[in-house]
């Protein structure tokens, strides 16, 4: 048994379960891995980056049982005091994380049509964890809850109001757990009072979003009712004129389902470049003179800068611009190009700081004379989920959120 209690963090997807085990004392990761293909005949489990091992049975519970076996091998199973679950969509029913009970699970089930690929999988993880860890407190942490502080003028779509009332059609926003964690770290790094501050956070990865955080609260965000709206992404289009989609349908005969697939899986960096959704591949291709890779990168940057500028308008003042996510943390090129676009804000860059590798971690990358502080802060959604579980489970770690 481990010296301190541990928190098991679970992210149940449509075909996978990602997990990590964190020490409740310091919230440090002790173990992490992923079970993939869990609904197929070729399910595997990889722990701490080791080669995948085939699983005998398919399904959520057998996969979680295999994860339990790995914990048992390391004498961690009896130390699991709390389980934290990432839940994709909390609708407007969850303003914050919640202890999982029958009522909470029923509410999640009720709003699952808003995110059918994710929420039902999240529920399957909760049900399986209940069977395998009877009596252990579970906590649901919602990707949308941080954005429940948006004012109506920020979350409403300019459609007939009845669609919001009757069908829940509105902006919900996503990446909330990441934006919340990074905003808390940013107040610490930049020496700001959470109660009097203005930040724009750019979470840039295969999925990407912008969030305006005023006095510690989300006041605007780029993703909408689904994660499709806003920035151009790896394979998602981001903002597109609906009239353009209607025109495509009229010319090609494609259905709504066809168009939905196209804007979700065939667009973005992949769609423009015709090469890849992976920015690392596109940066290499750009250096080799690939014109459409260059065009994809420039379009990506333009959209990011435009959204950062627009989100700054939701703040009373702009103290900091923060980059996070796989691209935000690791691409010096994208950060430089975005901040060059934002020179209207009086931003200057410190190239030596910007060009450091992602492993350099948290750092300020703006110049000393910059009117706005710009920084890189690695996100840590697993830690945020674990901290929420510890807070609600009343097991306080020796570290604070920031």
Swiss-Prot record:
Enzymatic reactions: propanoate + ATP = propanoyl phosphate + ADP
Binding site for ATP: 11, 18, 175, 203-207, 278-280, 326-330
Catalytic residues in the record: 143 (proton donor/acceptor)
Required cofactor(s): Mg(2+)
Entry EC number(s): 2.7.2.15
UniProt xrefs under Gene3D superfamilies: 3.30.420.40
Origin: domain of life: Bacteria
Binding residues annotated for substrate, in chain numbering: 86
Site (Transition state stabilizer): 175, 236
CDD domains per record: ASKHA_NBD_AcK_PK
Protein residues bound to Mg(2+): 11
GO cellular component: cytosol
Biological processes, Gene Ontology terms: acetate metabolic process; L-threonine catabolic process to propionate
Keywords: ATP-binding, Kinase, Magnesium, Metal-binding, Nucleotide-binding, Transferase
Pathway given in the UniProt record: Amino-acid degradation; L-threonine degradation via propanoate pathway; propanoate from L-threonine: step 4/4
Statement: the UniProt record of this protein carries the keyword Oxidoreductase: no
GO molecular function: acetate kinase activity; ATP binding; metal ion binding; propionate kinase activity
The protein's role, per its UniProt record: Catalyzes the conversion of propionyl phosphate and ADP to propionate and ATP.
Subunit structure: Homodimer.
UniProt similarity note: Belongs to the acetokinase family. TdcD subfamily.
Full protein name: Propionate kinase
Species of origin: Edwardsiella piscicida
Gene: tdcD
């Amino acid at each position: 048994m481990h010296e301190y209690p541990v928190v098991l963090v679970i992210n149940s997807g449509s075909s996978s379960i990602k997990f990590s085990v964190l020490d409740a004392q310091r919230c440090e990761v002790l173990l992490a891995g992923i079970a993939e293909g869990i609904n197929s005949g070729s399910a595997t489990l990889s722990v701490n980056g080791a080669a995948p091992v085939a699983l005998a049975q398919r399904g959520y519970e057998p996969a979680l049982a295999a994860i339990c076996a790995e914990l048992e091998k390391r004498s961690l199973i009896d130390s699991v005091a709390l389980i934290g679950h990432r839940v994709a969509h909390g609708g407007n029913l969850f303003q914050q994380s919640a202890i999982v009970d029958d009522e909470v699970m029923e509410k999640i089930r009720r709003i699952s049509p808003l995110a059918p690929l994710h929420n039902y999988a999240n529920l399957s993880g909760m049900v399986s964890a209940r069977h395998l860890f009877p009596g252990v407190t579970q906590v649901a942490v919602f990707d949308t809850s941080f954005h429940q502080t948006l004012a109506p003028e920020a979350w409403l779509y300019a459609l007939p109001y009845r669609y919001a009332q009757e069908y829940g059609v509105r902006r919900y926003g996503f990446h909330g757990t990441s934006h919340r964690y990074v905003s808390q770290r940013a107040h610490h790094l930049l020496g700001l009072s959470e109660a009097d501050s203005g930040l724009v956070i750019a979470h840039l990865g295969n999925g990407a979003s912008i969030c305006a955080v005023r006095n510690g609260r989300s006041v605007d965000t780029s993703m909408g009712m689904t994660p499709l709206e806003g920035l151009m992404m790896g394979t998602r289009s981001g903002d597109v004129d609906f009239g353009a989609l209607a025109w495509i349908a009229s010319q090609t005969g494609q259905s709504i389902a066809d168009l939905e697939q196209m804007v979700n899986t065939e667009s973005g960096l992949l769609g423009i470049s015709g090469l890849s959704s992976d920015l690392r591949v596109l940066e290499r291709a750009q250096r080799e003179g690939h014109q459409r890779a260059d065009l994809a990168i420039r379009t990506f940057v333009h959209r990011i800068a435009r959204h950062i500028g627009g989100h700054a308008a939701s703040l009373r003042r702009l103290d900091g611009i923060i980059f996070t996510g796989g691209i935000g943390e690791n691409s010096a090129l994208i950060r430089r190009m975005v901040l060059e676009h934002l020179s209207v804000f009086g931003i200057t860059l410190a190239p030596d700081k910007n060009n450091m590798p992602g492993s350099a971690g948290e750092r300020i990358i703006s110049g000393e004379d910059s009117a706005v502080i710009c920084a890189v802060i690695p996100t840590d959604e697993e830690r945020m989920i674990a901290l929420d579980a510890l807070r609600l489970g009343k097991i306080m770690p020796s570290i604070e959120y920031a």
